[in-house]
Amino acid sequence: MSIQSSCVRLDEGRWNPKNREVLEKLIEKYRDTNSYAVFDWDNTSIQGDTQLNLFIYQIENLVYKLNPQKFNEVIRKNVPTNNFKERYKNLDGEVLNAAKLANDIHKDYIFLYENYIFDKKLSLKEIRNTEEFKDFRAKMHYFHNALPGNFRSELACLWEFYLLIGMTKNEVKSLAKESNDVKLGEAIGNVIVESSRVLTGEAGIVRGIYDNGLRIRPEMANLYHELKRYGIDVYIISASMQELIEVFATDKSYGYNLDTENIYAMKLKSTTDNILLDEYNYDIPFTQREGKSETINRFIRPKYDGRGPILVAGDAVGDESMLTEFKDTEVLLIMKREGKLDNLVNDKRTLIQYRNLKTGLLDPK
């Protein structure tokens, strides 16, 4: 039976049966009509956050190409020095600020740079057992969590990206592949780390928390394959970095097999040698919140006679604009997370797809 005459059939997988049926009918309706669908990546196309997990991987393995002076500049860049909100305290109940954390992190980094990053005087196992590493790890995670809770989201994103400067784009892609492969094999869930009780520094003792681990979502990969199979183009718009999403979305080892030219994500400026700089490339929108809709309007809609996407999928407030912006959008696929996008649950276009928090797999309920 030819594709033209066959019925659309998504793999059953762990889809909610109603969601699967609606998606199949949508593909059937718009097959070969020069239509397109747009998806978020982190916690939508996959379980977990690929940018966050690279941040975690960098810390765990001390993969930086920054000398202490440049590292010190980067972690302070554009970050206000006023005290954080009341809830951001150390274990002694003292409210913290960026300057105190950065001072401690910088001191730790000097030791780590001299003994491992620049000169392998110690093994990775040995350096991880030092008080400096314990302090660095916890305070980096604490700082990372405090930024979006106290300042604009754009600043928090760029702070994370800038830790990759000094690397070429290909080096970042290689690092992303390493990180993905390791994190796909680790347990998912929150990890709590405590800073050194010996090297308390200016910030004192803090606890950092992070959401570790990644999982592939075969149901989403299959959905992308079927959309493409029936002539519906698939686009990714992500608030992670372009190089990271390209690796995960296009490398055949992960099974999504998407097209590089259909990926729109965050980009830093770079030198003529493709070395990343600590400056955002505003030639494209900041692909978060309204920037996702702007990306569709500027770069995607013109290819389709000004029509919006027939299907948009996301999981959080950063996706809300592109989920609600376009009158042509017939289905909103929400990969539901607790407390996220509750305002769209009752939209008649919405499909709610739950996940199992322990396994990261889709939940068919």
Q: How would you name each of these model-derived features?
A:
Residues 2-41, 47-95, 108, 133, ...:
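Non-catalytic pre-domain segments flanking phosphatase-related domains
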Residues 3-22, 27-36, 131, 150-151, ...:
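C-terminal cap/substrate-recognition subdomain and adjoining C-terminal extension
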Residues 44-47, 161, 212:
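Short secondary-structure transition/capping motifs
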Residues 74-170:
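Low-complexity, serine/threonine/proline-enriched polar segments
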